[in-house]
Amino acid sequence: MARYIGPKAKLSRREGTDLFLKSARRSLDSKCKLDSKPGQHGRTSGARTSDYGNQLREKQKVKRMYGILERQFRRYFAEADRRKGNTGETLLKLLEARLDNVVYRMGFGSTRAEGRQLVSHKAFTVNGIVVNIASYQVKPGDVIAVREKSKKQVRIVEALSLAEQSGMPSWVSVDAKKMEGTYKAAPDRSEIANDVNESLIVELYSR
């Protein structure tokens, strides 16, 4: 399955919520009607979605938020299911611990997609070692730093400036001058997307 490269706003409209696929400087505006599905006239039917349809839609929404393809998403779910605790919450925490997401959360990338691209271009080190794998699982205490040769990249500088203004999650700490951050701990569920109902995903894979 190929990665989606079409209009980002269309995906958010399809899910009826902002998936934060666009940077803050190009955020969705009133022209993007999230309550209207993609297409010339949007939703034309008031038909009730089945339970399975709702479960499938929730999975698609989370996949699109994190830029994950189906096979990889199934692996994350299997890993979450093996671990102790709430499977749905564990799934979200595994996704939040991806290096491309942590880069985004620390403000070094304006979107997760940009974070993924920067990671693949070897713009960061983890504990002093260059890592170019977007799915790398960051652990508490890990230090993510922008490499010296990448510190002048305009998109990193601009993204960090915007992040400083809007604020960063409590589970990361960032030294903007050094352009490095520490992943302090896995986020609490309350610090992850509130419009995600992970229990629907668990129900889907438990069918």
UniProtKB/Swiss-Prot annotation:
What molecular function terms (GO) are annotated for this protein? rRNA binding; structural constituent of ribosome
Short name of one Pfam family for this protein?
Answer: S4
Residue stretches making up the S4 RNA-binding domain:
97-157
CDD domains on file: S4 (cd00165)
Biased composition (Polar residues) is annotated at: 42-53
Keywords noted in UniProt: Ribonucleoprotein, Ribosomal protein, RNA-binding, rRNA-binding
SUPFAM superfamilies for the chain: Alpha-L RNA-binding motif (SSF55174)
Task: Give the span(s) annotated as Disordered.
Answer: 31-56
Top-rank taxon, per record:
Bacteria
GO CC term, one of those recorded = small ribosomal subunit
Question: Where in the chain are disulfide-linked cysteines found?
Answer: none
Against PROSITE patterns, the record matches this protein to: S4
Q: Keyword Hydrolase, does the record have it?
A: no
Return one Gene Ontology term, BP aspect: ribosomal small subunit biogenesis
Q: Does the keyword Zinc apply?
A: no
HAMAP family, alphabetically?
A: Ribosomal_uS4_B
- Stored PANTHER family: 30S 40S RIBOSOMAL PROTEIN, SMALL RIBOSOMAL SUBUNIT PROTEIN US4M
Report the protein's function.
One of the primary rRNA binding proteins, it binds directly to 16S rRNA where it nucleates assembly of the body of the 30S subunit. With S5 and S12 plays an important role in translational accuracy.
Q: Which NCBIfam families match?
A: PRK05327.1, rpsD_bact
Q: Which family does it belong to?
A: Belongs to the universal ribosomal protein uS4 family.
Subunit structure, as described in the record = Part of the 30S ribosomal subunit. Contacts protein S5. The interaction surface between S4 and S5 is involved in control of translational fidelity.
Q: Identify this protein by name.
A: Small ribosomal subunit protein uS4
Per UniProt, what is the name of the gene that codes for the protein in this document? rpsD
